[in-house]
Amino acid sequence: MRRPKKPYQGARPGGGRCRDWAHSFATGSRSARGKMTKTLRKSLRKFAIAIPLLALGFYFIPILTTIFIVCGLIDVLRNDRKDLALFSGYFLGNGLFTWLLSPFNLLVDLLCYRNPGVWKLEQFPEDYQREVNEVLDIFRARKDEIIADIDANFGVGRRGMYVYQWYGKHRIDNVAEFNKDFKYIKTIAVSVFSKRESTSWHFGPLRLSLRILYNLVPVKAEIFVECGNVKNYWYDNPQFIFDDTLLHRSVNEYDGRRYCVFMDIIRPSPFPRLIAGMLAIVSVSVERINSMFYKNWKMIGSTKPKKVETT
C-alpha cells in the first residue's frame, strides 16, 4: 500500500536562500559565459581579418613575411603566460608595434647581456647602480615638493606624466640636479595615477632600455605592477625594474593617487656607447610611437621657476 502523502507544511528552512543562491550562481555563470563569448568573438573577428592579410603577405613578400612571423614568435614566447590572450594581444592588439619591431629588438638582444625580464638593481654594473641611486636619492630627498607641484598642476585626469627628461630631451627644469645629461638614464619622470585607475595588459615597443619604477608613497592596498607571473606590491617592494616589451600592467585600486618615479635606463651591454647611440638615433621615432602608447596620459607642466644650481 502507498503511504498517504503528508500535508504540505510550507517551505523548508533555508529553502529560499538555496533558491536565491542557485539563481545568483546561474546568473553569474551566464554573465561570465557572456563575457567570455564576447571576448572570443572579438578574437575570432581579429583572426578573420588577419588570416587573409597573412595569406597576401606570403603570396607577395614571402621571405619578409616569414622573417616577421618567426621573429614575432621568438619574441612573444619570452612571455610567461602563453595563452590565446597573449598571442591575440601581441599580434592583433596593442602589441602590434612590438611585433613589427621584433627583428630590431632581437638584434638588440644579441648586443646586450642576458635579459631576465624582471631585474634586481644588483644585477646591473656598479656604475649603472650608482646613477640609479643618485637619481632616486634626489627624489627621496625632494619628494614632498615634487608631489606638491604635481598636485598643483594636475587637477583632473586619469593618468599623468611629470617629465624632467624624455629619451634625453630636457623638459621640466625646476630640479637643478636633473638638468644634466646622465650616461645611462635617458628618461626621468613621475607617473601619476588617479584613484582606482589602472592600465590594461599591454606591451612596450623597444628593448634598447629597461623600465625602472619606484613608488614614492607606498600604501598597503591593492596597488601593484604585474609583469607576466611576477606581481609586485609597492608596500612590499617600492622598486620594480623590468623589460617593458613583456606583457605587463599597473594597478591602483586605492582611493588616492599613486606616484611612481618612472625611468628608462639603457640595457647593460659590452657596447654601452653603441646602445646609447642607437637609442639617440631612434628617439624621434620612439617619441612618435610613444605618443600613441601614452594617448590616455596627460603630460603635466610645472608653474615652479627653474632651480639654478648654486656653487
Language-model regions: role of each:
Residues 211-215, 241, 256-272:
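A short hydrophobic beta-strand segment most commonly corresponding to one strand
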Residues 2-5, 18, 22-114:
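N-terminal alpha-helical membrane-insertion module
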Residues 176-195, 208:
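A short glycine-rich, His/Asp/Glu-containing loop-to-beta-strand
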